[in-house]
Amino acid sequence: MRNTARWAATLGLTATAVCGPLAGASLASPATAPASLYAPSALVLTVGHGESAATAAPLRAVTLTCAPTASGTHPAAAAACAELRAAHGDPSALAAEDSVMCTREYAPVVVTVDGVWQGRRLSYERTFANECVKNAGSASVFTF
């Protein structure tokens, strides 16, 4: 009987020692700082000749990071980020420039965008009739 009382006391003290700090930690967790102050926006953009990204070899690829500041290997990162912000991160919503005149030559160019925009996964592919149409379709995002 005395051994049972000792075991019960030992288990009670062990449970208090192990679980006591955990209870205090759960009370303190709402006061801790958030892991990140902004949602990540980091993209990889590619361009290649062909009708589909599956069959076209990428000719060029750039990185574009838009949060917290515009950076990456994209030659006009700040302008490209501003255009994507205006389109709410949707590359298909980028406004085409009406003032650009392009030939009707068919030399397909495919662009892809893969990555994360404001914490959401993004995957986009579009085929343009030629390089001129691609550059007119987005002032900065696909001009690299």
Swiss-Prot record:
Q: Which cysteines are joined by disulfide bonds?
A: C66-C81, C102-C132
In terms of Pfam families, this protein maps to: SSI
Site (Reactive bond) found at R104, E105
List the top taxonomic levels of the source.
Bacteria, Bacillati, Actinomycetota, Actinomycetes, Kitasatosporales
Chief site of localization? secreted
- Gene name of the encoded protein: sti1
Task: Name the keywords, alphabetized.
Answer: Disulfide bond, Protease inhibitor, Secreted, Serine protease inhibitor, Signal
- This one is known as Protease inhibitor
Function according to Swiss-Prot or TrEMBL: Strong inhibitory activity toward subtilisin BPN' and, to a lesser extent, toward trypsin.
Subunit-level organization? Homodimer.
Question: Mind telling me which Gene3D superfamilies this protein's record contains?
Answer: Subtilisin inhibitor-like
Q: Name one GO molecular function term.
A: serine-type endopeptidase inhibitor activity
GO CC field: extracellular region
Signal peptide stretch:
1-35
**Sorted alphabetically, which HAMAP family does this protein's record hold?**
SSI
Database matches in InterPro entries? Prot_inh_I16_SSI, Prot_inh_SSI_I16_CS, Subtilisin_inhibitor, Subtilisin_inhibitor-like_sf
State the similarity comment: Belongs to the protease inhibitor I16 (SSI) family.
Q: Is Transcription regulation one of the keywords UniProt gives this record?
A: no
The record's subcellular locations are:
Secreted
**Domain of life, per the record?**
Bacteria
Which species does the entry assign this protein to? Answer: Streptomyces lividans
